[in-house]
Amino acid sequence: YCQAYFSYDSKKSGGFTCSHLRFGDNVIRSPYLVTTPDFVACHVFNYMNMYEVLKGIKPNGTFLLNSMFSPEETVERLSSKVKKELAEKNISFYIINATKIAEEIGLGNRTNTILQSAFFKIAEVIPYELAVKAMKKAIDKSYGKKGENIVKMNYAAVDKGGEVIKIEVKKEWAEACTCGCSCQSEQTSDRPEFIRNIVDVINAQEGDSLPVSAFKGMENGTFPAGTSQYEKRGIASHVPAWHSENCIQCNKCSLVCPHAAIRPFVFTQDELAKVGEITTIKAQGKEFDGMQFRVQVSPLDCTGCGNCVDVCPAKTKALTMESLISQTDEAKNWENITKNVSYKSDLVDITKSVKNSQFAQPLFEFSGACAGCGETPYIKLITQLFGERMIVANATGCSSIYGGSCPSMPYTKNAKGRGPAWANSLFEDNAEFGLGMATATRKMRDRIERLMKEGLACTCCSDEQKALFQMWLDNRECPETTQKVYDALVPTLSQCGCDICKELEANKQFIVKKSQWIFGGDGWGYDIGYGGLDHVIASGEDVNILVIDTEVYSNTGGQASKATPVGAIAKFAASGKRIRKKDLGMIATTYGYVYVAQVSIGADPAQYLKVLKEAEAYHGPSLIIAYAPCINHGIKIGMGKTQEEGKRAVECGYWHLWRYNPSLAAEGKNPFSLDSKEPDWSKFQAFIDGEVRYNSLKKAFPEEAAALFSAAEENAKWRYNSYKRMASMDWNK
């Protein structure tokens, strides 16, 4: 008999999962987690520094560690505390380099089968030969339809899993120092109190030990922003290394990074002196005259997807993937640069080009999203453009899980203390939640307007203040001007002392024009939250809505939504979707006063940048629908090429880029612009064949798949031709 319980965090990449397994000759009735295990396995070496991995292990127990290092270096890298426990409890200690084995046999970073085999080799719950036979039988069943090559690779994983190495546990380890002094741990004095006392404890899976008193002052559920920067999980086996001699300074690597772990920095001579000896090159552009340029990677925040390397357009790649071990010094460079070098967004127009946009600080960083996530680059760029004044209502789904799961908060603030204010609502009412935020903000800004009008006649307010009041009243909806008024006016409010200035100071956060955003996936926007979304855009309120379209319910495991196209396999559509994809964007255009756009950052990042600029500037509801390649698609070329997959989707006509701008109609122009080129329809079938969600249907039901795939292509052509007709209309007739 066997029993299994699982505890896990919400990270979608490199997340913590603890499997509690029991085996016995009799029925097991233990409705609680294992607290005193006989066997412990740690599949990620870095977890040894993050969690109490050996907690509760029984004397004479067994410990298996997946280590990328030699036996000698493995021992050297273990903390004294771990070695002391191994010695005191006489633990049998084994290692295996499952990471290297997986790479060698073609499984990439998939180590689970190797480590499962290693478990059966040393745990001896059943004879190892029997376990090997059973595992290979399960492989045939699970992967048989995916081809002989996949089966052979997993067979090899099982065979290689038996190659464990036993490490001698020395008696002198029991005398190791565990005092917690500097010889045992890195200096933590620079970590904020909230991080040390709450975030670190929860991330170490010890959150249940926190008393209620630890949350004093946070009774309303508000948490500080930017906590993800302190995690430094180090989950990637390989990370990008920058080669300055090949770099053309396009900043595309920074644009596509799902986790904001690679960024361009421009150094003044003073800043260069502060950071010491690092490799830089002359910065391009007259704005950066006399300055130096560098692309910096944060290896401990990178998930190792490789999209940055894939999009690098240099003839000889300026980035290559290297082992994490070889890039550990870059972690110090990252910390040094981010502390001493400013972002140069004030020297360029960040909305002018993709390159310029990346000189702005991302205010969404180091989330728990999947490696290679196709969603997060969209959000990250929005925060770079508007993050200082953003308010976000986030629907439940992938974007809320990686966007704000306690205690990890990837939305952060800049050196001025400004950044997005973020909140998560229910699946079904997020649009209304965002509308409520926008309405409340508008009402508060109406109060600011009333106060400033009264201030113009106030005898207490100075002439300088009155000039600022008038400037604000003339430019209430201008972000740049209202920010200038804020910076000049707020320091003077406490000096005046009149009731008007006191009330203005109490509500100063509403002086600057806010950028209200509503985020969610296609399961929310097309399905469950569609009624609310329709209500919000019909209201005419000045809100910006981003629907991240993965064409399935990604967070809950890939169920079909109304965004799922014909022929795609998804849960609840196991034999292929039979109904064509809902055209949410076209539905929204029927109102006539809603800004609508369909984008793919992998296909045309400049178009997406233009859409963001237009949507934010439009005084009314804006809806942006973004194509996001997802792990649920089963992309054959891998999640390291999600940007390439988005590009291919547009090239073959699977996805189309367009904008509907009501402002153009007011000028007598056609509001509809078709931004993508004529598709190469000959590539359509090859594109869908490159994703398991389509390809697996062909293997299971070849004749039915052929009919559905043909219908999918015809639907795409029909949709494209309808867009073409709209784009060619003479709006004056």
Report residues per predicted region.
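Active-site cofactor/cluster-binding pocket
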Residues: Y1-I202, L272-E277, V566-K571, A628-A666
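Thiamine diphosphate
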Residues: Y1-P59, G368, G374-I391, S400-K413, ...
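A structural-propensity feature for long, helix-poor, extended segments
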Residues: F6-V44, M48, E148, V158, ...
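Short acidic, glycine/serine/threonine-rich loops at helix termini
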Residues: G14-T17, E52-V53, T74-L78, I105-G108, ...
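Alpha-helix capping and helix-loop boundary segments enriched in small/acidic/polar residues
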Residues: I28-P31, T35, A102-G106, I126, ...
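Ferredoxin-type iron-sulfur electron-transfer modules and their immediate structural context
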Residues: A131, M135, G144-D301, V309-W517, ...
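Glycine-rich ThDP/TPP pyrophosphate-binding loop and its adjacent helix/strand module
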Residues: C496-C498, V512-G520, D527-V543, I548-E678
